[in-house]
Amino acid sequence: NGKTASTDHVRANMHQRIYLSTSGGSTWTQVGEASPDCAVGAAERPFAAARARRRQGASLEALVHAVLVGACRCIDPQRHQPCRIETLMGAIGLQRRLQAQQPRRCVAFGFTPWKQRNLRRFLAGSQLRFRAPWRRIPQGVDAVVVWGRRAKPRLLEAAARRQLPVLQVEDGFLRSVGLGADLVDPVSWVVDHQGVYYDATRPSDLETLLATQQWTSAQCQRAAALRQRLVQEAITKYNLQAEPWSRPAGQRRVVLVIGQVESDASIRYGAPGLRTNRALLEAVRAAEPQAYLVYKPHPDVVAGLCRAGAGEDAAAQLCDEVLPQGSIQQLFTQIDALHVLTSLAGFEALLRGLEVHCWGLPFYAGWGLTHDRERCGRRQRQLSLDELVHAALIDYPRYVSRDSGWFITAEQAIEELVAWRAAPPQRRTLVQALFRHWGRLRRR
């Protein structure tokens, strides 16, 4: 009737050989001769072959290999290219690990629309609600999220009464190509459950890691390779355009002094002594009277996005040269030492093996790697540079791909920053241009 094979046709083909398909059908393995007794119909032959295959038995390892390696075709979510199953499993595992570390239901206070969009990326997997700073904490939440140290005391007291953890979010140490004050999206943020890394008045997740964590030799080797890649690619926090500068001729010691935004929370909570750029310059000149002092003001101040510090306009009278433009990474190859209050530039200089003097208490001070003018009683441990790097760049931050929106590793973040910096510069959006203009007007 055209729907089933005739009996004569079945019997005529009873003695054909049966083969098994392996490796997705690319090769064939002979099983044996078909028996007339099993020839019930052509439609049953595939099932008979399957039963024959399964009677042969297989180890668990062979089964796993066949299902996950032989039968799967995997695509790297970052590079959009074929990859090994181990690469995909590692990427999926990273998403699950980071999402497991964060509360399920969060309410965030005081985030601008631009930061709200980025917070959704860095807390992917959590349910997020947003509130103005003066609003109350709603019911049915597991945690409160704030930006840095900007939370109102009333909000912190309300969270404490309800025993809700407060997560403090801040920029990571490998952030972007361009300034955050220009609304450039970050590759890295940190989410701290205790404090925040620049606040030396109390512990943070990073300080606890540095004080207690034990790193294996393999982890230290990974940190060393990461550090070498950073130096090789000249990666810094903002990765601004570099301008050539050469140290003056002669044997005079060249010292770089880093300016900061004086209203920054890192000075308020991390500099118990000196707190102004002018005071820092005066102290460094007194400490190094014979050195050639180079002063670099903060890029946000140079761009007009933040106010200059009190008396900072007199910096030229306290140093030998002021360098307002360009990336700091180019200067690292030309100097002998660097002095900071709490600037991240000191950490970047440590990565390059430079002598670093801290007049405040940045997160990298107090571990035996810097020359410190202040002391923190909680920091008693001596660390290697690679241990510091593993904690600060691998354990502590979160990295999110600008392309895929997935959580990524520090190594993958460096790849993205290198490609981002090499790409043609993009024009500012209308929102970015208006924000910059408004910032300049506000600070007049």
Annotated model-derived regions:
Residues 1-444:
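Catalytic-core helical/loop segments in enzymes performing group transfer/polymerization on anionic/lipid-linked
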